[in-house]
């Protein structure tokens, strides 16, 4: 009887260890988006999007650290990748782009500080959580003091690069 109890104890311990093994081996996936890479205008134009949106924003002059800006392009992620570009901004040669999680109304939480990008080129972010709301905040170190009336384009897509 003692041998049976000992055998069952060892068997139960082995079964418990086996059930824990897959979760212990699982890799931690990034929970926050990060810049996948900066992309050229040609690369941006070649993206086959799931969704596309365009709009206008008054692009303000940035502070010295590039962290201020105006919120624009709120969206609910329908794919885990998004690219954003300022297509045109009279008087500007570059822009800063920051990605936020949440709504413009609630202010969101910053998930990527900022990237300085040439007008016409874009920033591509990956690791978005599908169904979550995001928006961008933009500014420009080369904008006139009164700002610049800029046009933007946003594309969501499955990974293509």
Model-inferred region functions:
Residues 76-77, 86-91, 140-142:
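Non-cytosolic beta-sheet module surface loops
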Residues 81-84, 127-142:
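Noncatalytic modules at the cell exterior or secretory-pathway interfaces
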Residues 95, 140-160:
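Edge beta-strands of jelly-roll/beta-sandwich modules across compartments, strongly enriched
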């Amino acid at each position: 009887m003692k041998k049976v109890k000992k055998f069952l104890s060892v068997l139960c311990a082995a079964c418990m260890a086996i059930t824990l093994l897959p979760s212990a081996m699982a890799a931690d996936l990034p929970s926050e988006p990060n810049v996948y890479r900066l992309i050229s205008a040609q690369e941006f134009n070649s993206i086959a999007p799931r969704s596309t949106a365009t709009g206008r924003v008054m692009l303000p002059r940035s502070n010295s650290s590039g962290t201020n800006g105006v919120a624009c392009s709120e969206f609910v992620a329908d794919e885990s990748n998004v690219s954003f570009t300022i297509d045109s901004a009279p008087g500007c040669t570059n822009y800063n782009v920051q990605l936020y999680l949440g709504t413009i109304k609630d202010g969101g939480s910053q998930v990527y500080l900022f990237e300085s990008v040439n007008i016409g080129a874009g920033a591509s972010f990956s690791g978005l959580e599908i169904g979550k709301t995001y928006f961008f905040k933009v500014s420009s170190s080369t904008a006139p003091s009164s700002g610049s009336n800029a046009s933007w384009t946003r594309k969501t897509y499955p990974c293509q690069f």
